[in-house]
Amino acid sequence: PGISPAHEVDGRDLGGRIATAVSHLPHEQREVFLMRMQGDLPFKEIAKIQETSINTALARMQYALAKLRDELKADYRDIAGGQP
């Protein structure tokens, strides 16, 4: 059967919203997020690249995920007409 055109458009739109939200992250958080999610790098390697501790790299990822969650939740509420 495959994916319906409406679902395909929704998927692209969601991808665009995610990309926009990622672009709003502070540089260091965005860098950690992308190295981990796109580059599949371990946190030990990310910490080495950023010349910081593993704990700092982990914290940056946690902050990035929290900010993305908040921004995307707000997007979802706007789309759903104010519903959570």
PLM-predicted stretches and their roles:
Residues Q29, K44, Q50-A74:
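DNA-recognition helix of helix-turn-helix
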Residues P26:
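ABC transporter NBD signature
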Residues V32-R36:
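A short pre-motif secondary-structure segment
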Residues P1-S23:
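Acidic, proline/glycine-rich intrinsically disordered inter-domain spacer in sigma factors
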Residues K73-P84:
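Short, basic, alpha-helical segments at the C-terminal edge of helix-turn-helix-like DNA-binding modules
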Residues G39-D40:
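Flexible coil/turn residues that form the inter-helical turn or adjacent wing/linker of helix-turn-helix
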